[in-house]
Amino acid sequence: MSTAASLHQSRKRKNGVMMMLCVVAAGIGLAWLALILGALLYKGLAGVSLSVFTEMTPPPGDAGGLLNAIYGSIVMTIIGIIVGTPIGVLAGTYMAEYGRFSKLTTVVRFINDILLSAPSIIIGLFVYELMVRPMGHFSAIAGAVALAILVIPVVVRTTEDMLNLVPNALREAGTAIGAPRWVVIRSVAYRAALSGIVTGILLAIARISGETAPLLFTALNNQFWSSNLNAPMASLPVTIFQFALSPYEEWQQLAWTGALIITLTVLALSIFARSLTGRREDK
């Protein structure tokens, strides 16, 4: 009896120690997150004004805004999503619906996993060699292509996973009434997996909206307003990078404000994506 009691006490002490270590580790992580968000709010909110969204990036020593950088980020992100999403959805559909157990799917999944974990600067260098050097100049379209390449693996993985979660009974029911396979995929599988696929697209947007490295090698930057996709275009991440390293207080303040804008945008997209996932699980 005493042996059982002592064993219980020993396990209880070990459990308490491990729980304490887990709480401390979680607290350290949350503390760093709180410090980062606190610094962004403290320094970023000080520069928030209407001029940030209505004026162009200023020359050194002058006041201004981030209008052209915000516009450039939106344009390249939209193009990247438009290009990357269909490719990712179709590839994920093939892997889940047509070639689930094929060797080609295994190879594609392996390559996709590599792309998911590859540093974005490698994608930037690849597009630089593929487009920028042959064209002879930086361009917004090259930046959009780099972002599209970053979008594809995220959407592929999400689409495949969501379609694999669709019960086979639904597919069999569609096939039983004589529907072709592509109709079953479109009307049954896609409908059941829609919220999960949309979640993956939103997470892809959240990822590329803060990417700096691939745009440094492709779209570079532009201090002026530009709607020409065949010319360098400003973007918020690159502008933040440039302004944060400058010795000018006005530029540094705009860098903090731009960082706050990106952080809040990514946070909002992530929360919305999680809410979609939660609704799907409730159903």
Swiss-Prot record:
Q: Which domain of life is it from?
A: Bacteria
> Which Gene Ontology BP terms does the record give?
phosphate ion transmembrane transport
Q: Where in the cell is it found?
A: Cell inner membrane
GO terms (molecular function) for this protein are: phosphate transmembrane transporter activity
Can you list the GO cellular component terms from the UniProt entry?
A: plasma membrane
Q: Which UniProt keywords apply?
A: Cell inner membrane, Cell membrane, Membrane, Phosphate transport, Transmembrane, Transmembrane helix, Transport
Task: List, alphabetically, the CDD domains matched.
Answer: TM_PBP2
Gene3D superfamilies in alphabetical order: MetI-like
Bilayer topology term: Multi-pass membrane protein
Sorted alphabetically, which Pfam families does this protein's record hold? BPD_transp_1 (PF00528)
Q: Where are the transmembrane segments?
A: 20-42, 70-90, 110-130, 136-156, 197-217, 253-273
Its biological purpose is as follows: Part of a binding-protein-dependent transport system for phosphate; probably responsible for the translocation of the substrate across the membrane.
Per the similarity annotation, which family is this? Belongs to the binding-protein-dependent transport system permease family. CysTW subfamily.
- Give the protein's recorded name: Phosphate transport system permease protein PstA
Q: Which gene encodes it?
A: pstA
